[in-house]
């Protein structure tokens, strides 16, 4: 045998030194579990070696073995430890399994479970309620609304609480397709949609919330009426058991729609603006994304001008109550047996309170009276037997132009309720006055409201926060109206029933004042979004082929959608005549 070359001799010696493993291949098999005398966990290919070992973490389910990958990803995220893929030699001995152990008892269990078979967890869709009765319409007449006892009723088309009957049956129901998107109650529309109405546009609240138009603070065009001084004694803390009663003061107040306003008609003839509206109507449109109750606005186009109007005794004439509450007040068709706490009754009560509260908190002193440039345009002393209410009508103009080439202006009639002296410089401050009313904090539909008599003084912030939640749309509208009028202070009164079971006797628990813009910031109210909505709706009407057309903007009663219809000439007049006939039939039936 020839001797191997010097380069291969070292390799041959290395191979000869390897142990003889027979038919196997690879390193020798060993059962040693120590490394230099230190025990260690065996290596597993399932372990991730990209992190430090955490020897202090325990497995979540009390087991050392890894579960399925899906279970690990769902429940054991960020809890993986090195060596978790193999059985640990440090695991304590398994205790005796006692899962099969049980105690036999012959005592009959009579306890009842809270949620038994067929328990109802959600309210189902209820039946459709009937239409509410409409109050007498005033037509185009400039009739005033009495704000005191014995005045005209504040009827209207308010239908805020109409909806489905609460499901109180014994059987539960299963969720179906898009049950989350179905309304909890079925309300009726504020106006009957006829078949010959043409649908122009359908806008949901998501699109409305994205609209934006920056504008200036506006300028005064003219002002009418007069103002009495605000009584600052109402700002003082109320002494317990010494609250002031809300008095029914008979004063002439007016709520004339846009196209019937003689001042707006004169401004339209002078081409002072393209869009005309009142603060009551404009605030509803600007706060549309917050509204829940159904409403409608009549829009008239005359040439290149747009008039935002309201129907007589429509929903806009009434002050809603707990419209935005999670469980709003129920109507009679929904099973409510408490007549004074139904939506329409609460709205009439709130409207009555607001009119009388504004008249009561002013001092009717001629020496402190502030007269505007012109007299009240709606008051006629020869026809009225009561004095006019303290009210100033300011006609203000806003620039809604989107380009320098084409200018678009809006004129709005705003209202101021009182005037007060600034404590610093003694200048007059314009004041708007509104009132929140407490009816029954323990009744259905109260929305978790606190007891004002015990909490208003100590937890005023919590009371206001609850009202912002339950009456978001109403408070937003009042704030917008104050900003449109360029008021310096917005006064909010807190009025409660003397007895929760009686809705015609009230007491004033306190008054709080805010700067309108500060209050808007607290409510996250963006006026630029409201101006964007107004300009968008006006542009849709101006795109119509007819220069003399009428439109109706309707809030869907059960969805967060606005629909714009173009209506034939005379369609709304026919409906008004039908309402008059219904009223006459009702009066004859009562007789």
Curated annotation (Swiss-Prot):
SS bond list: none
Gene Ontology CC terms, in alphabetical order: cytosol; eukaryotic 43S preinitiation complex; eukaryotic 48S preinitiation complex; eukaryotic translation initiation factor 3 complex; eukaryotic translation initiation factor 3 complex, eIF3e; eukaryotic translation initiation factor 3 complex, eIF3m
GO molecular function annotation: mRNA cap binding; translation initiation factor activity
Pfam families per UniProt: eIF-3_zeta
Entry's transmembrane regions: none
InterPro entries attached to this UniProt entry: eIF3d
Residues of the signal peptide: none
Domains as described in the record: The RNA gate region regulates mRNA cap recognition to prevent promiscuous mRNA-binding before assembly of eif3d into the full eukaryotic translation initiation factor 3 (eIF-3) complex.
Chain's role: mRNA cap-binding component of the eukaryotic translation initiation factor 3 (eIF-3) complex, which is involved in protein synthesis of a specialized repertoire of mRNAs and, together with other initiation factors, stimulates binding of mRNA and methionyl-tRNAi to the 40S ribosome. The eIF-3 complex specifically targets and initiates translation of a subset of mRNAs involved in cell proliferation. In the eIF-3 complex, eif3d specifically recognizes and binds the 7-methylguanosine cap of a subset of mRNAs.
HAMAP family: eIF3d
Subunit structure: Component of the eukaryotic translation initiation factor 3 (eIF-3) complex.
Protein name in the entry: Eukaryotic translation initiation factor 3 subunit D
Lineage of the species this protein comes from: Eukaryota, Fungi, Dikarya, Ascomycota, Pezizomycotina
């Amino acid at each position: 045998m020839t001797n191997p070359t010097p380069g291969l001799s070292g390799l041959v010696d290395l191979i000869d030194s390897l142990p003889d493993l027979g038919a196997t291949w690879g390193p020798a098999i060993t059962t040693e579990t120590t490394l230099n005398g230190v025990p260690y966990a065996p290596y597993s290919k399932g372990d991730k070696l990209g992190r430090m070992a955490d020897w202090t973490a325990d497995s979540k389910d009390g087991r050392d073995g890894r579960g399925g990958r899906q279970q690990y990803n769902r429940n054991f995220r960020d809890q993986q430890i090195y060596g978790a893929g193999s059985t640990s030699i440090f695991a304590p001995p398994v205790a005796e399994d006692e899962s099969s152990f049980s105690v036999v008892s012959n005592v009959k269990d009579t306890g009842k479970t809270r949620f038994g078979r067929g328990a109802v967890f959600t309210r189902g869709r209820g039946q459709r309620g009937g239409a509410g009765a409409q109050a007498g319409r005033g037509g185009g007449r400039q009739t005033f609304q009495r704000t005191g006892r014995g005045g005209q009723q504040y009827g209207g088309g308010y239908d805020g609480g109409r909806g489905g009957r609460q499901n109180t049956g014994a059987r539960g129901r299963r969720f179906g397709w898009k049950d989350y998107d179905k309304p909890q109650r079925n309300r009726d529309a504020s106006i009957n949609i006829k078949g010959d109405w043409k649908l122009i546009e359908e806008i949901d609240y998501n699109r409305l919330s994205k609209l934006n138009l920056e504008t200036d603070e506006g300028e005064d065009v003219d002002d009418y009426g007069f103002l009495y001084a605000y009584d600052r004694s109402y700002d003082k803390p109320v002494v317990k058991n010494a609250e002031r009663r809300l008095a029914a003061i008979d004063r002439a107040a007016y709520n004339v729609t846009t196209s019937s306003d003689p001042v707006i008609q004169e401004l339209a003839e002078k081409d002072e603006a393209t869009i005309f509206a009142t603060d009551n109507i404009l605030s509803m449109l600007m706060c549309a994304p917050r509204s829940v109750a159904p409403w409608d606005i009549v829009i008239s186009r005359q040439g290149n001008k747009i008039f935002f109007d309201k129907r007589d005794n429509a929903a806009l004439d009434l002050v809603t109550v707990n419209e935005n509450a999670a469980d709003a007040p129920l109507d009679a068709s929904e099973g409510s047996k408490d007549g004074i706490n139904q939506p329409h009754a609460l709205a009439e009560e709130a409207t009555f309170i607001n009119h009388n509260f504004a008249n009561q908190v002013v001092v009717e002193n001629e020496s402190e009276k502030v007269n505007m440039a012109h007299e009240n345009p709606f008051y006629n002393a020869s026809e009225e037997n009561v004095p006019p209410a303290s009210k100033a009508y300011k006609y203000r103009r806003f620039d809604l132009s989107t380009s320098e080439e084409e200018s678009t202006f809006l004129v709005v009639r705003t209202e101021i309720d009182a005037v007060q002296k600034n404590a610093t410089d003694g200048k007059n401050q314009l004041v708007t006055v509104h009132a929140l009313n407490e009816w029954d904090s323990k009744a259905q539909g109260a929305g978790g409201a606190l007891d004002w008599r015990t909490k208003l003084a100590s937890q005023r912030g919590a009371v206001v926060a609850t009202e912002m939640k339950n009456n978001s749309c109403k408070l937003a509208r009042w704030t917008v109206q104050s900003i449109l009028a360029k008021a310096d202070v917005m006064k909010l009164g807190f009025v409660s029933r003397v007895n929760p079971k009686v809705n015609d006797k009230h007491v004033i628990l306190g008054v709080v004042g805010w700067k309108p813009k500060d209050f808007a910031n607290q409510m996250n109210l963006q006026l630029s979004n409201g101006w964007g909505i107004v300009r968008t709706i006006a542009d849709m009407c101006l795109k119509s082929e007819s220069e003399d057309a009428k439109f109706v903007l309707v809030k869907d009663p059960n969805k967060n959608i606005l629909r714009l219809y173009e209506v034939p000439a005379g369609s709304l007049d026919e409906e008004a005549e039908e309402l008059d006939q219904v009223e006459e039939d009702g009066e004859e039936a009562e007789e």
